[in-house]
């Protein structure tokens, strides 16, 4: 089944992720309509796909031939395209750059649930070849994760015209927390957060989170009942002009200590792991790239007879987690999440 898509906005990864994936999956998707707050960009992309540019996203979503929307970028309209897609019964692919306010998470969940549309959130780290292969190794060779370490280094001027530095930091933290939860196969049960901000800035330039994954009463008695500890650090303290310093001797994006071994990941394709037999290096370049994995999963969710709500629940859980992390920073203590 070929889906006719409406495209709203262009992400930072449009040229490297979404555009190549749409071309590779031309038998599953057809871009039929394009909206962008900058009309010249909409016209250019529409020409690439022989699609129709629109002056308004509601007008585009009201078009009867459009079956689903790729919502890739927030602009002046915020999350209004999600409301419009629900009004017109269009499936929603919600890109990782969309700004979703934590305090509106419950309203978003209720809106999508009542509309009955398919909803998929973009969690690119989950579907990177290295992440998927690690999950296989956890199930077959390495055993359950006991400790996870994640580090992300951003340039100090990491904001954009649409995003403030704090919003970028929050988005990174939500994605990193979700990544740890995905790898461990357990929800976050508690968070202890610390932060630092420079004297000449009102925004945080460093944040560290200590997470406990699992270990709740609901997990007791299961094979995966022991909690996993995750340590996340995300910093934007190096000026963008110091390009060499930003990338100097960065640690692996994720390190995982499992029952039977240790793994080091760098996205999208690098995975090195160790067990009693020694060092193993995975060759993952031939695997489907992240963009194709994401869009293939979206196509499956739209065409499936079974409606999946897990992505929406994960988005709401991530937004709740960032709120709890802020509270932990303010109160200087470990906070527990409602399960």
Question: Can you name each region flagged by the protein language model?
Answer:
Residues 1-48:
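N-terminal Rossmann-like dinucleotide-binding module
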Residues 13, 284-296, 313:
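Active-site loop of classical SDR/Rossmann-like NAD(P)-dependent oxidoreductases
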Residues 32, 67, 146:
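Conserved acidic residues
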Residues 38-40, 49-111:
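Beta-loop-alpha module in the N-terminal Rossmann-like domain of NAD(P)-dependent dehydrogenases
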Residues 46, 59, 68-71, 117, ...:
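C-terminal helix-rich "cap/oligomerization" subdomain common to oxidoreductases
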Residues 55, 94-95, 119-121, 265:
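Hydrophobic residues in well-ordered beta-strands that form the structural core
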Residues 76, 100-160:
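A contiguous active-site-proximal alpha/beta segment in oxidoreductase catalytic domains
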Residues 171-268, 295-304:
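Contiguous beta-strand/loop segments that form the cofactor/metal-binding neighborhood of enzyme cores
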């Amino acid at each position: 089944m070929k889906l006719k898509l409406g495209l709203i906005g262009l992400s930072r990864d449009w040229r490297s992720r979404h555009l190549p994936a749409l071309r590779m999956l031309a038998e599953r998707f057809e871009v039929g309509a394009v909206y962008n707050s900058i009309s010249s960009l909409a016209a250019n992309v529409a020409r690439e796909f022989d699609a129709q540019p629109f002056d308004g996203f509601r007008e585009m979503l009201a078009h009867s031939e459009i079956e689903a929307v790729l919502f890739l970028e927030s602009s002046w309209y915020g999350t209004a395209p999600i409301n419009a897609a629900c009004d017109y019964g269009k499936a929603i692919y919600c890109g990782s750059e969309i700004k979703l306010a934590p305090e509106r998470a419950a309203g978003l969940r209720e809106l999508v649930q009542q509309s009955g549309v398919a909803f998929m959130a973009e969690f690119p780290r989950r579907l990177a070849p290295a992440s998927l292969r690690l999950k296989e190794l956890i199930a077959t060779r390495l055993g359950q994760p006991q400790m996870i370490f994640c580090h992300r280094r951003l340039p100090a001027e990491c904001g954009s015209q649409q995003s403030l530095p704090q919003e970028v930091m929050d988005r990174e933290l939500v994605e990193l927390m979700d990544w740890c939860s995905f790898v461990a196969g357990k929800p976050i049960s508690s968070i202890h957060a610390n932060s630092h901000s420079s004297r000449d800035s009102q925004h945080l330039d460093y944040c560290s989170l200590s997470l406990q994954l699992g270990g709740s009463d609901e997990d007791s008695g299961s094979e995966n009942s022991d909690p996993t500890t995750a340590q996340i650090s995300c910093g934007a303290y190096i000026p963008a002009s110091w390009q060499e310093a930003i990338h100097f001797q960065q640690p692996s994006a994720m390190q995982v200590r499992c029952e039977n071994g240790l793994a080091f990941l760098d996205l999208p394709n690098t995975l090195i792991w160790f067990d009693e037999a020694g060092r193993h290096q995975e060759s993952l370049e031939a695997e489907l790239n992240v963009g194709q994995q994401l869009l293939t999963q979206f196509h499956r969710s739209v065409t499936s007879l079974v409606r999946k709500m897990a992505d929406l629940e994960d988005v709401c859980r991530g937004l709740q987690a960032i709120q709890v992390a802020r509270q932990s920073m303010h109160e200087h203590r470990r906070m527990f999440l409602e399960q």
